[in-house]
């Protein structure tokens, strides 16, 4: 077994052991429904003060023109 193969085997072994240990500590407990909805919404909407191409993509549901660091007016989520 050469060095690269040995390194890959150790990496896979460490990953498997880490996953098993996380499961014993409750790392893979199922999410509550509210948590899952919050995580999904956060991953699909644009957070506050980020550029917004459309109103419906903002987490707050609205965006307004605000001055950026160059003084230009850009649409950002509220």
Swiss-Prot record:
GO MF, one annotated term: calcium channel inhibitor activity
Bridged cysteine pairs (disulfide): 45-59, 52-63, 58-77
GO CC term, one of those recorded: extracellular region
Tissue: Expressed by the venom gland.
Record InterPro entries: Omega-atracotox
The organism's place on the tree of life at top rank: Eukaryota
Subcellular location field: Secreted
Keywords: Calcium channel impairing toxin, Cleavage on pair of basic residues, Disulfide bond, Ion channel impairing toxin, Knottin, Neurotoxin, Secreted, Signal, Toxin, Voltage-gated calcium channel impairing toxin
Marked site positions, Critical for insecticidal activity: 51, 68, 76
Chief place where the protein resides: secreted
Signal peptide: 1-22
Propeptide, chain numbering: 23-42
Pfam family, one: Omega-toxin
GO biological process: defense response
Presence of the UniProt keyword Disulfide bond in the record: yes
Purpose of the protein: Inhibits insect, but not mammalian, voltage-gated calcium channels (Cav).
Entry text on domains: The presence of a 'disulfide through disulfide knot' structurally defines this protein as a knottin.
UniProt similarity note: Belongs to the neurotoxin 08 (Shiva) family. 01 (omega toxin) subfamily.
Protein's recorded name: Omega-hexatoxin-Hi1a
Species this chain originates from: Hadronyche infensa
Organism lineage string: Eukaryota, Metazoa, Ecdysozoa, Arthropoda, Chelicerata
